[in-house]
């Protein structure tokens, strides 16, 4: 009987793309695959763990096209997240949330019209009529896809069952402030990770790592002192300093967050 790899091989590209990576800005991993957002080439690559390219999603030119495998187009895609054999993509340059059905390779737009605009909470009846504003990172669960929206400094969620958008946290103002829902504020939220009922967010201009409790949308700063209070220091949370953190991931075997402290050129760990 053919296994999943055999079935998937039938839709793999016959040759590896010749272009090197150009500003890769997103990564997602499964037990046997790596997915890379090759941002500068406007494409998504599916690789095995040895680094061999198996499939390319997107023609490699900046455009906004749904459809099958390499007949599709992205524009500066960044954040990636996998859930239930679906790859979710923050298509930043198209101001859209998109998904790739991995078994077939089909690319679909969940919401976004290709232009920056003011997102509106509510049901999404016509995906291409919904405005987003620079979605940068995504984190998917079985039921929701969470997005950091760098262009409007808020955290949004797309409900996969209802097909609806909701703002989970953030006032929209460029600030770094704890609180609940719209009473909280972010300063260009970037990297995102979801663990059970908690979201962890890199607040880039706030030089901070923040948490969001999904039960009540309460935002709390774990590390960071606020906008312009950046630095380069290890130590207890109240003394540690970051600068423009961009990416975050949870350790698989310990309660530790790994943080790409981009402005300092460091990889830091934060014990929860």
Where are these regions (language model features)?
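Blade-level signature of beta-propeller repeat domains, shared across WD40, Kelch, NHL, RCC1
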Residues: 244-272
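Short loop/turn segments that connect beta-strands within beta-propeller blades
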Residues: 48-52, 101-105, 159-163, 213-217, ...
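Gly/Pro-rich loop segments of beta-rich domains
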Residues: 1-25, 51-78, 106-134, 164-188, ...
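Short coil/turn segments that connect the beta-strands within blades of beta-propeller domains
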Residues: 31-32, 84-85, 142-143, 196-197, ...
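A short loop-to-beta-strand structural motif that recurs across blades of beta-propeller domains
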Residues: 42-45, 95-99, 106, 153-157, ...
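Conserved beta-strand positions in repeat-built beta-propeller and related beta-rich domains
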Residues: 36-40, 89-93, 147-151, 201-205, ...
